[in-house]
Amino acid sequence: MKLKLWLLDLNTELVSGRDAVFLWGVSNDGRRLLLVDDAVENFFFLIPSINPEEVAKKVLLEGKEYGVIKTDVCDKKVLGRPVKTVKVYVDRSENVEKVIGKLGKLKVFEKTYEGDIRLSTRYLLEKGLTPSSWFEAEVEKDGNLPSIQVETFRVKATKPLEEERVPELRVIAVHFLKTCEKGSPKPEYDPIVAVSTYDGKTLRQFRYDGKTDKHLIENFVNQVKTFDPDVIVGYGITEDWSYLAERCKRVDVQLEVGRNYAKPHMSVFGHVSVTGRINIDLLHNARENPQLTEYTLDEYARSIGLDVSPQIPEQKYYEYLSNPSEAEKLFKQSEECSKLIYRIWTVLSDFAIQLSQITGLPMDHVFTASSGHRAEAYLIREAYSIGELIPQRGEKPYVSYTGGLVLQPEKGVYENVSVLDFSSMYPNLMLKYNISPDTYVPSGEKCEDCFVSPESKHRFRKDYRGVYTSMLQKLLASRRAVREALRSVKEDSVEYRVLDARQKALKILANTLYGYAGWVGARWYLREVAESAAEWGRHTIRMAIEKARQMGMKIIYGDTDSLFVIDGEKLEKLISWIESELGMEARVDKRYRRILFTEAKKRYGGLLENGSLEVVGLEVVRGDWAEIAKETQLEVLRIMLETMDINKAVSYVREIISETMKGTVSMEKMVIWKRMTKPPEAYEVRAPHVLAALELSKRGWRIDVGDKVGYVVTRGISKIGERAKPYQLVEKKDIDYEYYVENQIIPAAMRILEVFGVDEQTLMREPRRGLMAFGTD
């Protein structure tokens, strides 16, 4: 019997004492199915130090009692060089590590490879299957297979299929509402207040009944079982599952939400797995956005272009719930959050599916895995296809090297600035100079025809493509083909949406490889590779800068793979020269009407052509400043970039100072927030937020790692740290407004205004009387 299945997820289990791979998916007729393959093989490779045939016999003889069942001698490659290897088959995946340890005592091999490849990954490689893709399977019914929520078959054979269509997936978005009176809610003490779900049609909410959250949890679990979603999506749901699991223990509920009736469990990359379903935590995707500072759901939604109303902050939850007339607003917000999470998923789902198909990672892993792990997943597939052995992870010493070129900006404001983007430079350089661990020629080894890096003189072979460059060649060729296909389809079509998501995923993966090369945790880490790519990158940027200046263009800033250029008329000529003479792609990424640079690198603010502000590195985008300081800086920046009216900006700052000194600014805007990276008592340096956390702990608040602590600075003559008090324990009249003016508002405003020659005294209406001039009349 043949079936066609779209592979949703996979995991491994023991069936009748044997390793088996469980393939969960959606059939072409819309059924949810499980296919079980228990004819899987576990193996790893040895590089023998003596005759390979002798090693194979000795390993089989000595290893039988530990689980070795067969050995073969085969030809493979290590860093592009042919080697004879011994392939060691082991009865169970759980025994591989033990077998390697025991065999080490034989002292007949130099190194092991692929001993830490997960069985599910191995299976996909061996069968040529890819998550989020279609395959055909020859199956049979078997009454000995486990009885679970979906129909189950035993696999006899599989074959990948070339089909782009995505089945209609059942998706449920979930939002958990939790709070407590003192500090962050803890599952040991604090019940869940509400769970809101949205499946694209139906909105549901289950609430705490005032006595226990047992019924709330039972209703939620039953809904998951009844709706049987393929995808569960949340924001911060990794932590929510952990919280929910602890609550289930407290109220005696079985959290059986997997398709095999199993509980959620921690998997790779810090990901929580719900067996048979895709569990998506959008917070992981949000954390990849360098422009976000607070990582709240509404901030994240706005960053991807969604319109969102301001939300009640978490620190206000308990206050709202304690007031019957306000509580309903919070419950309504939870419902809206579930709908917002669903909306975000509809925006990102195509991208997630395409990235899954390209990397070979299940959909719920592509967001939790780091960019390096995603690149490595693709590299593993590429290495397998060319017979290259996959190195095992191991401890490697980190040796620093010089990174990308960052120019010192000239302080000032500039108009009509174009940003020339070289984001595809590093992939193209790695291709051009064949930069890869397996093409690197070690010092002392002969090479008659090599590429030589500009500074360190590292050498790379020209005679064959490396694993990195083979990967890049395929990625860039695929992206060109996809972009060409985009031209022939309508922009409002599903096909366009899918193709666009794919070309973005291909671009991100290609651009990731340069960073991966310098990641010490990489399986194929080689410092010389990363160092050489950086050298050729700096060399390329310097040549572009030199040419631009020869053409009479002004370069005001440069950062790794971008140049900020004035004189747009000559820009197209420069781009043509870069493409023809340097062989690199360059394009105008954005244009600023005006842009302001401070003297520091990586700190600027600009007014884009569409009228929006972009801020990099300034206080307004950093989390350790009070809201009043951030608001002031952002508005001063806006005034100056839009109007260049110094008097208007100074008047605005004076008004803020006056309102602050009069006490009319809300207390919430005075709070300075810091996240705890360790328990309060573990800090050796007692910074203000640590002292505030310790004070809260004394008063019964539960402060843990990851919690945000908010404090305000109060009046007094002692050190600032000693006057930093938890905002919850302070009355507004006790706030030291002079501190906020002198150490928050003025420094934040001056970061912008000093560029225009404004000094601090200019901000004071009556300098001789000092700050008291701004007090109450």
Predicted regions and their residues:
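Conserved DEDDh/DEDDy metal-dependent 3′-5′ exonuclease domain
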Residues: 49-53, 58, 62-97, 205-293, ...
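Common nucleic-acid-contacting/processivity interface regions adjacent to the catalytic cores
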Residues: 2-6, 16, 22-24, 125-126, ...
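C-terminal polymerase-core module
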Residues: 566-723
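Conserved RNase H-like, two-metal-ion catalytic cores of nucleic-acid enzymes
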Residues: 2-63, 152, 156-231
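Low-complexity, acidic/Ser/Thr- and charged residue-rich accessory regions of DNA metabolism proteins
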Residues: 92, 165, 177, 695-777
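Short active-site loop/helix that positions an aromatic residue
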Residues: 240-249, 423-437
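Active-site cores of enzymes that catalyze phosphoryl transfer or operate on phosphate-rich substrates
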Residues: 159-203, 466-521
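N-terminal accessory regions of nucleic-acid-interacting proteins
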Residues: 81-167, 359
